[in-house]
């Protein structure tokens, strides 16, 4: 017989609810106005973990193409005006930039974990870059 996954369900039977104090009952019944339902919220970190799994599976570029292209052209203006770029050149630049950033964030996360934290900070990124030899 195959095993099936058990899901949590609300119980219908069981013990009868205990009587509450008058002040507790008044507090609970007072704010009910029109039965407005709160929107569903996930626990902190749940959505972040889901996004991490989704982006680790994907292979598409994460930075939008046109804003990246404008940034490349703006930076290139400082070196030489009227430069032209093939679309494949900008695509190659974007691939390289995203690969670099992903690697940097991985190293930054390792620095934060080493410091017994789960949140990356500016000093983690500075340490990661210094260990890579990019910055003195």
Swiss-Prot record:
This is Histone H3.3. The modification Phosphoserine is found at residue 11. Phosphorylated by IPL1 to form H3S10ph. H3S10ph promotes subsequent H3K14ac formation and is required for transcriptional activation through TBP recruitment to the promoters. Core component of nucleosome. Nucleosomes wrap and compact DNA into chromatin, limiting DNA accessibility to the cellular machineries which require DNA as a template. Histones thereby play a central role in transcription regulation, DNA repair, DNA replication and chromosomal stability. DNA accessibility is regulated via a complex set of post-translational modifications of histones, also called histone code, and nucleosome remodeling. It comes from the Eukaryota. PROSITE patterns: HISTONE_H3_1, HISTONE_H3_2. Belongs to the histone H3 family. Gene3D superfamilies: Histone, subunit A (1.10.20.10). The nucleosome is a histone octamer containing two molecules each of H2A, H2B, H3 and H4 assembled in one H3-H4 heterotetramer and two H2A-H2B heterodimers. The octamer wraps approximately 147 bp of DNA. GO terms for cellular component: nucleosome; nucleus. It comes from Candida albicans (strain SC5314 / ATCC MYA-2876). It is found in: Nucleus; Chromosome. The modification N6,N6-dimethyllysine is found at residues 5, 15, 28, 37, 80. The keyword Repeat does not apply. The modification N6-methyllysine is found at residues 5, 10, 19, 24, 28, 37, 80. GO terms for molecular function: DNA binding; protein heterodimerization activity; structural constituent of chromatin. The modification N6,N6,N6-trimethyllysine is found at residues 5, 28, 37, 80. GO terms for biological process: rRNA transcription. SUPFAM superfamilies: Histone-fold (SSF47113).
């Amino acid at each position: 017989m195959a095993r099936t996954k058990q899901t949590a369900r609300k119980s219908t039977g069981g013990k009868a609810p205990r009587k509450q104090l008058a002040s507790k009952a008044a507090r609970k019944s007072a704010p009910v106005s029109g039965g407005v339902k709160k929107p569903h919220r996930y626990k902190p970190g749940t959505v972040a973990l889901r996004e991490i799994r989704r982006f680790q599976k994907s292979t598409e570029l994460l930075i939008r193409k046109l804003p990246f292209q404008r940034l490349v052209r703006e930076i290139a203006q400082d070196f030489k005006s009227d430069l032209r770029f093939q679309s494949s050149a900008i695509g190659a630049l974007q691939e390289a930039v995203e690969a670099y950033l992903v690697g940097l964030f991985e190293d930054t996360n390792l620095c934060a974990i080493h410091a017994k934290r789960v949140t990356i900070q500016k000093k983690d990124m500075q340490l990661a870059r210094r260990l890579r030899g990019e910055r003195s």
